UniProtKB/Swiss-Prot annotation:
It is an enzyme of class 7 (translocase). This is ATP synthase subunit alpha 1. Produces ATP from ADP in the presence of a proton gradient across the membrane. The alpha chain is a regulatory subunit. InterPro entries: ATP_synth_asu-like_sf, ATP_synth_asu_C, ATP_synth_asu_C_sf, ATP_synth_F1_a_nt-bd_dom, ATP_synth_F1_asu, ATPase_a/bsu_AS, ATPase_F1/V1/A1_a/bsu_N_sf, ATPase_F1/V1/A1_a/bsu_nucl-bd.
Length: 498
């Protein structure tokens, strides 16, 4: 019987193992994320190219596949396409002058065509600065909003959370704060995460109309952009801020808002079949925000002396601050401004709930004169809120309690502020001095706004007040001449309301 002979060599296929270390194959596509085989040398957050033209970033590594997020929305990617890793991690392109730039996650200019080439780049993901390179927060970052600068002050290098329901004035506080930096030598970065394109355009137009784009950068992704782009956007904004801080600059960065950032990350991890945790968020939701916000610090003089002040925003539902993401970010930051919808609807703008809001380290950075004039304001407002409830029930109050109610009403009216009309440090000093020294007790609450406007108008017309404003950084307490000037201004206006 004849035996059949097989030539096994002709069935052998040579597998290039070295090639598989740097290359892979698209196995599955699912709503903006890719499951890929190969890529044995891949690292987390490494940039990749699909079919040599589509940009992606590695977001998931496990034994079965490599998970890639697509930066650009596209329907041109097919199963079987080649994937190759690049020689760098995901980064944002930078220009010599970042002022006035409106860019996306990778540093590409938005809303205008530009042939200008980037001069450098900065990685989106970096470690927190070492503890020995960080300095204390001792310099103020004035928002121009009386209730914040007096009761919950913010210092340069601080992380202060702004949280509240939808349409409670969070973005308006951020925009007012940016506009108030026009003469403060602070570079501002507004990071829009997954917002409507029309809303982003409206914010940009407001900044442009108030000449704030001259010292600002906008990093934006719209709701129509990919989930990966929305997830990466705050890190891109922080990378730009770090590049400016390394030049010794003071930077203010605003994240609008981190709730949408957490939602985008939740969607990505669920697509990668990662097990969900509380409220379906993944287990490392705390880490993605802490690793971002802890990069905002005040550096010591030996390491440039620059600072990053972060104002992250969180959207709450029905004023619930005990939800997963709000409690996470509250524990990461140095304080919070809690905005209440009912205050906003009653016309109390900015709608800051003083009883819940706190600034843990901002007091050390507050201007000493404002610190002295503000020391009992929180108590006055807290007592007013308690006694006001008794008045609502028709209970009679003694003379001392009625004085507390009167002071509370006056202070509440003083803290009301029109949008896009920030107050300078000396403006706030005049207002608080008038309140603390009893000059407003006979002014009806309905006329407080008019009194305040006329008071500032009279003050700005005096040469000695202008000189006081120019020198305020070097003045730590009011002299007799300053006190006399303030009382003359207040009494002149007071006679018109008596």
């Amino acid at each position: 019987m004849k035996t059949i002979q097989f030539d096994m060599n002709k069935y052998e296929t040579h597998v290039d193992l070295e090639y598989l270390k740097e290359h892979g194959r698209v196995e599955k596509i699912s709503d903006g994320v890719i499951f890929c085989s190969g890529l044995e040398n891949a690292a987390l957050h490494q940039a990749v190219l699909i079919d040599e033209r589509h940009r992606g970033v590695i977001l998931e590594l496990n034994e079965e596949f490599v998970g890639i997020g697509l930066i650009d929305k596209t329907s041109d990617i097919l199963e079987g396409m080649n994937v190759s890793v690049t020689d760098h991690f995901i980064e944002v392109n930078l220009f010599d002058d970042m002022a006035g730039r409106i860019i996306d996650t990778t540093g590409k200019m938005l809303y205008e065509e530009s042939e200008e080439q980037p001069t450098s780049s900065s990685p989106l993901f970096r470690v927190t600065p070492e503890i020995m390179t960080i300095d204390s927060v001792t310099r103020p970052l004035n928002t121009g909003l009386a209730v914040i600068d007096s009761i919950t002050p913010i210092g340069r290098g601080q992380r202060q959370l702004i949280l509240g329901n939808r349409q409670s004035g969070k973005t308006q506080i951020a925009v007012d704060t940016i506009i108030n930096q026009h003469d403060q030598n602070v570079h501002c970065i507004y990071v829009a995460i997954g917002l409507k394109a029309a809303y982003i355009a409206e914010v940009i137009e407001t900044l442009r109309n108030h000449d704030a784009l001259k010292y600002s950068t906008v990093v934006a992704t719209a709701a129509s952009d990919s989930l990966t782009a929305q997830y990466l956007t705050p890190y891109a904004g922080m990378a730009v801020a770090e590049a400016l801080r390394e030049q010794g600059k003071d930077v203010l960065i605003i994240f609008d808002d981190l709730t949408k950032h957490a939602d985008a990350y939740r969607a990505i991890t669920l697509l990668f079949n990662r097990p969900p945790g509380r409220e379906a968020y993944p287990g490392d939701s705390f880490y993605i925000h802490s690793s971002l916000l802890e990069r905002a610090v005040q550096m010591n003089p030996e390491h440039g002396g620059g600072s990053i002040t972060a104002l992250p925003m969180i959207e709450t539902l029905s004023d619930d601050v005990t939800a997963y993401i709000p409690t996470n970010v509250i524990s990461i930051t140095d304080g919070q401004l809690f905005l209440k919808s009912d205050l906003f609807n009653r016309g109390q703008k900015p709608a800051v709930d003083v009883g819940v809001s706190v600034s843990r380290i901002g007091g050390d950075a507050q201007h000493p004169i404002i610190r002295k004039l503000s020391k009992n304001l929180t108590l006055i407002l807290s007592q007013f809120e308690e006694l006001k409830e008794l008045l609502d029930f028709g209970n009679g109050l003694d003379e001392g309690s009625m004085k507390m109610v009167t002071d509370g009403r006056i202070l509440t009216e003083l803290f009301k502020q029109k949008i896009l009309s920030p107050l300078s440090v000396t403006d706030l000093i005049v207002i608080l001095y008038a309140f603390q020294n009893g000059f407003l007790t006979k002014v009806p609450p309905a006329k407080i706004e008019s009194f305040k406007g006329l008071l500032l108008e009279k003050a700005h017309a005096r040469n000695d007040f202008i000189a006081f404003s120019n020198d305020i950084k070097d003045i730590s307490e009011l002299s007799d001449a300053h006190t006399k000037m303030l009382e003359e201004i207040i009494q002149e206006v007071g006679r018109l309301f008596s």
